[in-house]
Amino acid sequence: MNSKHLVGGLGMTTTGEQVTVIVYPYRLPKRLKPLTECVLETQKNFSNEAIGTVLLLCIDPKAKFELVCRNDLRVVIVPPNHPLFRETLETMPRLCGFVHLVYAALHDLASGIASSKVFAYAVNQCPNDYREWSKGIGDEADEVLSYIIAELSTDPKFYRQFAVFAD
């Protein structure tokens, strides 16, 4: 995993603090050091003033709400069952396809269809059809999701709403 696989944007807290919001659509790794290094690398694409707090929205159902600090970087891991997860998605600029993908995975997790697995879905604007687009789990899903992000990033509207972080 590297920074080109992360999607997100800049947000503002209710207290006016600028934060970086990143959607992390994979299982959370057991060791968080490589992940925080990747986030730090991602931050550099924003400029130094963005370094501070990162909200990492994680769709891994086993993730716990926690704060991880590395150097000057504070990463807040926000699991899908935490109120901050939904609130943050709702206040971010809409990338309807990607948000649909995240919610599709969350819907299945909540329904027990994939109780311990996170699926990656190809983006499909017909909500009833997304299960047909299931592409597997684990590394295979990571590759599919990377492909989806790459495809979306060619759309000019994508850049106006969200940032795609590339190496």
Language model segments and positions:
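Charge-rich (often acidic), low-complexity intrinsically disordered regions concentrated
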Residues: 1-167
